[in-house]
Swiss-Prot record:
CDD domains: CcO_II_C. GO terms for cellular component: mitochondrial inner membrane. Its EC number is 7.1.1.9. Cu cation A2 binds at C196, E198, C200, H204. One of its GO terms (molecular function) is copper ion binding. Component of the cytochrome c oxidase (complex IV, CIV), a multisubunit enzyme composed of a catalytic core of 3 subunits and several supernumerary subunits. The complex exists as a monomer or a dimer and forms supercomplexes (SCs) in the inner mitochondrial membrane with ubiquinol-cytochrome c oxidoreductase (cytochrome b-c1 complex, complex III, CIII). The lineage of its organism: Eukaryota, Metazoa, Ecdysozoa, Arthropoda, Hexapoda. This is Cytochrome c oxidase subunit 2.
Length: 228
């Protein structure tokens, strides 16, 4: 989860988020190199006294500053397109989870099992346990098995919402009358926190998301206890 004064991204908990981290570092390196180059050129032009008295046109330099940015943009565009296609690819998911946004809570349905659905509200501060997370804990967590492909279907009943878990690299818009889907895999056990990322009204800040990732055998026991 995000911590105080954290300057970087959250620790990745899915292969998708690992790829997003790599792309972030790749792009930041290119931007740093451009900044240093432009700063050096500006400094060199500002502090030297040289003047070219025979300069009529700059065809060579114009070709360079047209072609070079195009090449740099290609180095950014190709990894970005690859990631976009990876995010849209859904291969035989093990479990389908449906998330429905409301003002101001989430409801979940496990489509592969009968009668398994519940609402998830934020735990108010005055009811929070000592070891709870303020404005992040919920009364009913989403329980999912680790190391399994999970498909999530997201929609809303009233206004626009956005189902977002940063450490998994997941952000899906919840649009009334429309089903959006995304595929992800959690590669370690733990609790993963997220929040609605689309302004949806007065209590937009108070509809958190909590995912509890557990091994498959414990997940089967949880499913059995919930359906019984």
């Amino acid at each position: 989860m995000a911590t105080w004064a954290n300057l970087g991204l959250q620790d990745s908990s899915s292969p998708l988020m690992e790829q997003l981290n790599f792309f972030h570092d790749h792009t930041l390196l290119i931007l740093t190199m451009i900044t240093i180059l432009v700063g050096y050129i500006m400094g060199m032009l500002s502090f030297n006294k040289f003047t070219n008295r025979f300069l009529l046109h700059g065809q060579t330099i114009e070709i360079i500053w047209t072609v070079l940015p195009a090449i740099i943009l290609m180095f950014i565009a190709f990894p970005s397109l690859r990631l976009l296609y990876l995010m849209d690819e859904i291969n035989t998911p093990s479990i389908t989870l449906k998330s429905i946004g409301h003002q101001w809570y989430w409801s979940y349905e496990y489509s592969d099992f009968l009668n398994l659905e519940f609402d998830s509200y934020m735990v108010p501060t005055n009811e929070l346990e000592t070891n709870g997370f303020r404005l992040l804990d919920v009364d009913n967590r989403v329980v999912l098995p680790m190391n399994n492909q999970i498909r999530i279907l997201v929609t809303a009943t009233d206004v626009l919402h956005s189902w977002t878990v940063p450490s998994l690299g997941v952000k899906v818009d919840a649009t009334p009358g429309r089903l959006n889907q995304l595929n992800f895999l959690i590669n370690r056990p733990g609790l993963f926190f997220g929040q609605c990322s689309e302004i949806c009204g007065a209590n937009h800040s108070f509809m958190p998301i909590v995912i509890e990732s557990i091994p498959m055998n414990y997940f089967i026991k949880w499913i059995t206890s919930m359906t019984n």
